[in-house]
Amino acid sequence: MDIRQGLGTYIGSDYTPPYLYLLLLISRVKNYPWQYLVKAVSMAFEVLLAYAVTQLAGLQVRGAGKRVVIFNLTLMLPTVVFNGAYWGQCDVIYTSLCLTALYMALQKKSARSMILFGMALSFKLQTVFFLPALLPLWLRKDIKLRHLALIPAAYMAMMIPAFWGGKSVHHALTVYMTQAGTYNFITVNGPSLYNFLPTGMDKEMLYTMFS
C-alpha cells in the first residue's frame, strides 16, 4: 500500500487529520509496541513544550542555569507526564504549538505566529482558548491584523495530505462538529461531583437528592 492509499483508508476516526498523519508514520515502524510509539509522539512534543516555556520565561529570567531548571521542571509537571508519556494523549501537541506561537508574537514575528496558531488549530479545537491573547498582542502591535488570515490558511494547508488521500473539504471543515456530536457531555472522566452520579439517573431522584 502506498502513502496515498494509507491516508485514504487510515483517516476514518474523529481525530483530526494532522494527528492521524503522525499515527500513520509511526505505523510504519515494525516489531515495536504501538502504545510506546504513540506515547513517543507526545513525548517529542513535550520537549517542544518545555523549550517554548523556557523561551517565554527567558524573556524575563536571566541565566542559563535558571532556564535549564525551567526546562526540566516543565517536563516533570504532573499534567505533562500523565497526559503525554503516561496516557499517550495529544493535547501537548497543540499546547506546544500555541506557546511557540505566543513566543513568536512577542518577538514580533507576526506571520510565523499566526501560522503556528493555524497549525495548532488543525490538531485541537481547544486552541480557540488561546486566541483571546491575540487582542492584547495586537494592541501592543506584536501582531498585524492582516496576518490573521494565515490562521485559516495554515489550517487548510495542514489538511492537504488528507485531501490527497481522498478526504473532502467538507470533512476538514466539519471534523470538530463531528467530535461535538460524539461527545455530547458537559464533562467526561473529569474530576468533578458528576462522577458520583450514575449515568441516566432519573430526574425525580436527582431532585430528591438535592432538595
Regions found by a protein language model. Give the residues of each.
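Membrane-interface alpha helices of multi-pass inner-membrane proteins
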Residues: 82, 98-104, 111-137
